[in-house]
Amino acid sequence: GEKVIPGNTSYNRRYYCVQLVNTFQGVPVAAYAEQLVGTKITGLTSGVTAYVDSILLPEDSERGNLTIYVNYLDSSTTNNSTQTFFDAEELACNEIITSGLLGNSSISVGAPFGLTLSNEAAQSGSSFTIQNGIYFIRGNFVNVEKETLILDQYGTDPSYRIGLFVNEEIITADLDETLNDNSQGFNNYAAPGADRLKISTSLIKKSLDDFDDGSFVELGTVVNGGLRTVSKKT
């Protein structure tokens, strides 16, 4: 099988990120961090602006730091030389931020929502992305949703096999009531319909020597940061 509707993939060896102090003004930044995805943030000292692509929560970070992965948009408005956020710099967002932990208040546009680490806050990781598409897998047309997988959180020399984990499950009328007969205008629990096969995928990484591929469709391989192969078939 192969791609039917791409589904294109891309490898980013420098997935820029900035690490934040986990709490700001007594509130865990994780309480509202997900709201930052898709917004623009600005360093209030550096003037650097970036688009937020994804968030890594402290419990998922190998360093224990809340980390924001970004695409830098603008450099400093003063000398156009700064390309990354400063250490110990407050960041602001171009949208209002709310959270139950903020009580009845919110963080207004342009007001600081977080503080970068005091040392080496700006880092680079690596990532692999797949776009929305349809793949022909195991005799079926399978929808694949856009997903970005972080390869190394704070490193730019990853070595992995990258691909889709294929999950198959049988959906019965007990799990999905819409499978019951509805010819009378309602779901008839006394007349369950046939079971359905559901195939879903998720983007995963494997070590280079892991060839247990029973539920794995390889899309590409990176070795010491270099993209070696991009599979065209699944």
Question: What do these predicted regions represent?
Answer:
Residues 1-234:
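Subunit-assembly interface segments of extracellular/virion macromolecular structures
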